[in-house]
Amino acid sequence: MPCEGTENTLAQSIARQIVDVHPTGFGTVDRKKLDAALMFSQQASQAASMCADACLNEGMIKDMRECVRSCLDCADVVDATVKCLSRHAGWAESAVPAILTAAIAALGVCAHESARHASMHMHARLTAETCRKAETACSELLESLTK
């Protein structure tokens, strides 16, 4: 079992190792930006799923309805994005820019909605922070693809 805090580094290095030995080499994609987008997106998807569940268990479910919806939408869109980023398909010419754009939007909405509840619920604060990191990483990767 890995030491505490090493799980993300391990996952990142495995993704990087596979990219490094992939027959296409993933073309000219910026590997550091790809690594960051994959790592932070995986974290955001997990945080959003867990936050939705936590919201459902709060006493004020009516107030949390939009947070639950945005978290579930975010998790689904970001999961699909991670899958697309994990395979090389021509990148700029493929659906990758479109799905990255969708992920950036979903992450932004989830971060905004979660932040509205952050002062009362720690899970919402953590989700908002994690989604913002993933939003930034995905934006940077998208920008590098469209240059």
Predicted regions and their residues:
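Amphipathic alpha-helical hairpins
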Residues: 2-147
